């Protein structure tokens, strides 16, 4: 994610406020910390116009940075957007406020499938509201895959994890999300093993599979959209939103390219980004106002349409772009939800063991 700051309060107004404190009441300001470009283009401006609360939007460059800021305390933020497992650790560490449900207006509108997934998070579900979510799966250029393998098993990880099949797509480019936890979970689940395992025998099996694939992996990246659109990649294991963003970009450029996304039949991981209030937030009341504003169906639909990720609000689905709303690999049925692997907080020794497996894979010599 890009590291930029967006200040949605007039510099002149701030200057006057500092110069004439006797004439101005303190300006209402909400400080939030979120990924770049993770709202609709007019979300923040409309919130300010409606409430009079100015928004300072600081953009985080990684979940690790967010977690470090919260654990250190004194961040100055009123609202943050942690991922599900990060929120679990932060709540357990006492860095988040338990939410007052009486101040929230849309908790009953959360997608039922997400409500079930949230039961896996013992601590953070008391302190978070789901924002957007998604899965890890296969985004591919439909024409390029068909040219190379007309009967490609596009709904199966076999297309990537069987070396003899991956080899057929190496010339048009394969990428893999640069996330050891997500990829290893998907690989281990594919092998019939515990997705979050760090047992030596499980990691050895995962390593054996991955090393056979290494010659065919062109890139490790978390944002493959540009390479997909420019024709540098034809197959990517990554976020569900990649397909929507790639298709939108290609259409805007007048390219006659069809991208598709599939959740593998073997199962895959699911993630949720959430909204949470730091324990030392100075203006929690502004945070509640923003959460309620964002969770309105029309606002959540606008965010979903802009970001390419499904909304957490079930009532917003009707206003989401038809291509997303009617895609069963983005808005899921119960059977697909049942194949999803929720996040899990992994102990540090296990994380280090998994990271060693991942590093060995990434640094292995490719063709």
Per-segment meaning from a language model:
Residues 9-19:
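Bacterial N-terminal signal peptides
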Residues 26-90:
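Early extracytoplasmic/lumenal segment of secretory-pathway proteins
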Residues 78-82, 217-218, 234-239:
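Paired acidic/hydrophobic, glycine-rich loop segments that form the ligand-binding mouth/hinge
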Residues 86-89, 235-255:
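A ligand-binding cleft/hinge motif common to bilobed small-molecule-binding domains
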Residues 203-211, 255-276:
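Periplasmic-binding protein-like
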Residues 273, 278-339, 343:
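Mature extracytoplasmic/periplasmic domains
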Residues 334-367:
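Conserved C-terminal helix/tail region of periplasmic/extracytoplasmic solute-binding proteins
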């Amino acid at each position: 994610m890009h590291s930029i700051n967006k200040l949605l309060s007039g510099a002149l107004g701030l200057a006057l406020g500092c110069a004439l404190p006797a004439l101005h009441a303190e300006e209402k300001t909400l400080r939030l910390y979120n990924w770049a470009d993770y709202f609709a283009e007019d979300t923040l401006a409309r919130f300010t116009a409606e409430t009079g609360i100015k928004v300072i939007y600081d953009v985080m460059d990684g979940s690790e940075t967010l977690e470090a800021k919260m654990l250190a305390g004194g961040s100055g933020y009123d609202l943050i957007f942690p991922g599900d497992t990060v929120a679990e650790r932060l709540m357990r560490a006492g860095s988040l406020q338990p939410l007052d449900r009486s101040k929230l207006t849309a908790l009953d509108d959360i997608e039922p499938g997400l409500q079930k997934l949230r039961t896996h998070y013992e601590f953070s579900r008391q302190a978070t509201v789901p924002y957007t979510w998604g899965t890890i799966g296969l985004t591919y250029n439909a024409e390029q895959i068909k040219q190379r393998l007309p009967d490609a098993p596009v709904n199966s990880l076999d297309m990537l994890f069987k070396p003899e099949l991956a080899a057929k797509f190496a010339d048009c480019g394969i990428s893999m999300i640069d996330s050891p936890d997500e990829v290893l979970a998907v690989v281990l689940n594919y092998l019939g093993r515990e997705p979050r395992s760090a047992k030596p025998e499980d990691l050895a099996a995962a390593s054996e599979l991955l090393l056979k694939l290494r010659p065919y992996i062109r890139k490790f990246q978390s944002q493959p959209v540009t390479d997909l659109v420019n024709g540098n990649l034809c197959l990517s294991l990554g976020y569900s939103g990649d397909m929507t963003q790639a298709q939108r970009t290609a259409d805007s450029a007048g390219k006659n390219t069809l991208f598709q996304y599939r959740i593998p039949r073997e199962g895959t991981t699911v993630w949720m980004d959430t909204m949470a209030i730091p324990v030392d937030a100075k203006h929690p009341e502004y945070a509640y106002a923003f959460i309620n504003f964002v969770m309105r169906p029309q606002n959540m639909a606008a965010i979903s349409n802009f970001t390419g990720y499904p909304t957490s609000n079930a009532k917003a689905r009707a206003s989401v772009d038809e291509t997303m709303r009617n895609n069963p690999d983005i808005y899921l049925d119960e059977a697909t939800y049942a194949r999803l692997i929720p996040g899990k907080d992994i102990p540090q020794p296990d994380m280090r063991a998994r990271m060693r497996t991942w590093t060995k894979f990434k640094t292995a010599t490719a063709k």
